[in-house]
């Protein structure tokens, strides 16, 4: 009798072990959802390649000193750590995960090495070798909004399109059949400049497939903050301007022809064109314009501490200046040193 009871309890125990193991495995596979209003990176950073992304106390960045492998660090450039050894861009981050577009095969070194396949990827921040390809496509831009990734694609079969996919990799769908730069998300709405017919500001509500004309002005690189739209005015010599969507008022922030820009809490960093190009910054109301550096620069990415940029046509060195403090241009030596230190191990 006692042996029979022991046998029964043993069977029950084994069953419970299997059940608990299955539950744990399912929980580990479950993709943690983001709260409504989540946006994976700033529009300005994504327009400039999405090479830097700040989230939850860390800055995730593509390190050009290491073939654009994915690294992370504290905003003050301490605690540098290599996460993924492939060439990455259009970085987004929120909650448990970091999302990115994989461009190439990279060096194949480091935690979380990914096979040489371009596409949209999701990786765990604290366990970067746990990585998933959400869609193997040719793309240029992706943005995380709530629990979906919006991204553009190009293929011989489908042409160009704007697509959406859940962060789990499910429910992929085509939203628009023309090229869109998905970068600017504000108030549960994706904003973009229409690439065909005109450059009007368009908007598509998250979860919708219908795009609406918001502003009948030909613009480029719209960054929406509340009711304000910072952008480049195509028919005003590509000047840097701000539109008030409520009143319709336009404010010229900088008359110089502008190639690209990015917006911080206090300043707008912008690159001028012409015979004497300069990287400059101006207060968001259009006052206090000042030169950051002479010459042509691009890849203007901003964090809470620094503005990062590189010379046009060059990958390194990466320059930086305090994003909201006094201008003091130096080089991003910590990124280079991290690669050198890793090579000695």
Regions found by a protein language model. Name each.
Residues 1-17:
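N-terminal Sec-pathway targeting helices
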Residues 26-82, 345:
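N-terminal, intrinsically disordered, polar/charged segments of Gram-positive cell-envelope systems
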């Amino acid at each position: 009798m006692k042996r029979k009871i022991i046998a029964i309890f043993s069977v029950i125990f084994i069953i419970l072990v299997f059940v608990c193991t299955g539950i744990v495995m399912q929980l580990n596979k479950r993709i943690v959802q983001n709260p409504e209003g989540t946006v994976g990176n700033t529009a300005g950073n994504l327009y400039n390649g999405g090479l830097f992304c700040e989230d939850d106390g860390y800055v995730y960045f593509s390190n050009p000193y290491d073939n654009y492998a994915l690294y992370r660090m504290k905003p003050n450039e301490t605690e540098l750590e290599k996460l993924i050894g492939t060439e990455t861009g259009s970085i987004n981050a929120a909650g448990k995960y970091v999302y990115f577009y994989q461009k190439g095969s990279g060096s194949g070194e480091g935690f979380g090495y990914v096979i040489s396949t371009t596409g949209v990827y999701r990786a765990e921040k604290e366990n970067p070798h746990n990585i998933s390809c959400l869609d193997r496509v040719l793309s240029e831009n992706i943005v995380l909004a709530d629990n979906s990734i919006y991204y553009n694609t190009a293929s011989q079969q489908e042409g160009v399109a704007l697509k959406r996919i859940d962060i789990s990799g499910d429910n992929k769908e085509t939203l628009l059949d023309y090229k869109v730069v998905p970068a600017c998300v504000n108030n549960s709405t994706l904003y973009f400049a229409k690439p065909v017919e005109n450059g009007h500001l368009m908007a598509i509500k998250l979860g919708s497939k219908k795009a609406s004309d918001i502003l009948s002005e030909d613009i480029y690189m719209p960054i929406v903050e509340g009711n304000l739209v910072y952008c480049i005015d195509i028919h005003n010599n590509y000047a840097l301007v701000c539109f008030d969507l409520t009143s319709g008022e336009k404010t010229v922030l900088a008359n110089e022809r502008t190639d690209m820009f990015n917006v911080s809490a206090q300043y707008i960093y912008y690159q001028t064109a012409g015979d004497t190009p300069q990287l400059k910054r101006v207060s968001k109301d259009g006052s206090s314009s000042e030169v950051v550096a002479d010459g042509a620069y691009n890849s203007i990415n901003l964090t809470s501490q620094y503005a990062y940029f590189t010379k046009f046509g060059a990958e390194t060195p990466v320059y930086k200046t305090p994003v909201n403090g006094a201008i003091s241009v130096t080089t991003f030596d910590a990124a280079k040193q991290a690669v050198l230190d890793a090579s000695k191990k």
